[in-house]
């Protein structure tokens, strides 16, 4: 029998580590916060987040898309239009972001 299935405390730790791997870098919470209530194009995200290298932004968006947190819609236009939005899985993370903002607001300074 697996240790994680037999021990809820271990399972909780495993889940926390997995979640941190997905959202635990410098840019991801800012990207998710920017996408919380709207769809954005690449340049809009770059402007909103500020200071992120385009290669880093592209890699992070691809990773979030692969994890099922962000969706990417490509429109057949010239020039091509690509929009990013939160998936249902990503929208489920909004309360966590709000909690992070509340915690940061309470303890900032």
Predicted regions and their residues:
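Amphipathic alpha-helical dimerization/coiled-coil segments
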Residues: 2-4, 11, 33, 92-109
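N-terminal helix-turn-helix DNA-binding core of bacterial DNA-binding proteins
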Residues: 10-59, 76-77, 83
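A broad detector of short, well-ordered amphipathic alpha-helices
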Residues: 17-18, 88, 102
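Short amphipathic alpha-helical/adjacent loop interface patches that line ligand
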Residues: 39, 49, 61, 90, ...
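Amphipathic, soluble alpha-helical interaction motifs
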Residues: 48, 67, 103-106
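C-terminal flanking helix
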Residues: 63-65
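Basic, amphipathic "hinge/linker" alpha-helix immediately C-terminal to the N-terminal HTH DNA-binding motif
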Residues: 76-99
